[in-house]
Amino acid sequence: MAVPLMQQIRVGAYLIKQRLMGVERYPLVLMLEPLFRCNLACPGCGKIDYSDVILNKRLSVHDCLEAVDHCGAPVVSIPGGEPLIHKEIVEIVEGIVARKKFVYLCTNALLLEKNLHKFKPSVYLTLSV
């Protein structure tokens, strides 16, 4: 998958800024997991071994955006579980996009047709299957 030129430039500028400021260690990608639950039970995935107490937990929109702001990384990857199960995933993605962060929404695509229309097209949003 090719990385769009705008993303290359923005991430490159972020890297240069960190170097110029003398920052030695800085985040590049935030792995944001708003939930562990999935609509599949793949044997190779360790998430299915978690108890229902863990699988039923959800991060709120506020908690997700607070993590994005605190981390400061230019790229946010949202893996799963299956993020499209989260009832507020659209609001989470919109909040991240509004912050001009590049979002990679990783999905198994089983719920994509049902939910795709809810997401506004953006140069900051990439769906990864």
Where is each model-derived feature located?
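Non-cysteine beta-strand/loop elements that form the S-adenosyl-L-methionine
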Residues: 122-129
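Conserved alpha-helical substructure of the radical SAM core
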Residues: 2-115, 124
